[in-house]
């Protein structure tokens, strides 16, 4: 299976993962956004938008990561969580 196919399959598998801690969910979000949209754009949400700011930070951590590298990281993380 090529990388895009593996990424799409991992995206579907991620929907059925058992409950995960927020930090793991934020990692999944940040890697997914980097894989699909590239580097974060726009301004960081305001200080009272806690969820938006956390998501922005999770994505920002991946700045500079190539989209294919992010796709592979996402597949690897989903595989790790599914096997746990």
Model features per residue range: what roles?
Residues 1-84:
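A charge-rich, low-complexity, intrinsically flexible signal that marks solvent-exposed coils, linkers
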């Amino acid at each position: 299976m090529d990388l895009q196919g593996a990424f799409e399959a991992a995206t579907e598998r991620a929907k059925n993962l058992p409950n995960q801690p927020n930090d793991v969910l934020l990692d999944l979000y940040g890697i997914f956004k980097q894989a699909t949209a590239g580097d974060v754009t726009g301004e960081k949400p305001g200080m009272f938008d806690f969820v938006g700011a956390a998501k922005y930070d999770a994505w920002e951590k991946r700045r500079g990561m190539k989209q294919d590298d992010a796709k592979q990281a996402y597949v690897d993380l989903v595989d790790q969580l599914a096997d746990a």
